[in-house]
């Protein structure tokens, strides 16, 4: 199997609310960290061609490196942390199952520097806070998680977003 293709199945697992399995498959896709792996970071190019001067007809000579790492990171950001910018602002759909007790990431969204922090303190009911204030959430029955939306107008530099379980 190829990492690049596997990332699309991982994305689907997250979207369908099977976060535990998605994290397992994501971990398997880190081919550099395993002695024995079932995935390749390469993909067949499918660029079958004809070149009479070189005697090439109907085959692809070699694998080529893909954007596997990019799609891997995209899965962590969009599906794991659930950071999904859209035209109206920022959606937060953090995976219901996180593989760690704490995680954080700082990034720029719509020109504003934000920090998203996840913490599992065993409370059981997910809360999402902005700068220490609870944000109204809604339950996504497909992803099986609490979600929130922050409008573009409400985004500001050094915003601290906390997802608390």
List PLM regions with ranges.
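Generic helix N-cap/helix-start motif at coil->alpha-helix transitions
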Residues: 1-3
């Amino acid at each position: 199997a190829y990492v690049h293709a596997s990332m699309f199945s991982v994305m689907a697992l997250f979207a369908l609310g099977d976060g535990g399995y998605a994290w397992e498959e994501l971990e398997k896709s880190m081919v550099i960290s395993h002695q024995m792996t079932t995935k390749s970071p390469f993909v067949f190019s499918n660029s079958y061609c004809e070149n009479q001067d070189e005697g090439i007809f109907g085959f692809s000579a070699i694998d080529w490196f893909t954007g596997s790492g990019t799609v891997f990171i995209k899965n962590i950001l969009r599906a794991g942390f659930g950071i999904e910018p859209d035209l109206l602002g920022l959606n937060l759909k953090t995976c219901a199952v996180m593989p760690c007790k704490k995680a954080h990431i700082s990034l720029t969204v719509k020109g504003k520097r934000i920090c998203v922090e996840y913490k599992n303190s065993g409370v059981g009911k997910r809360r999402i806070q902005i700068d220490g204030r609870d944000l109204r959430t809604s339950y996504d029955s497909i992803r099986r998680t609490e979600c929130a939306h922050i409008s573009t107008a409400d985004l500001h530099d050094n915003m601290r977003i906390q997802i608390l379980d």
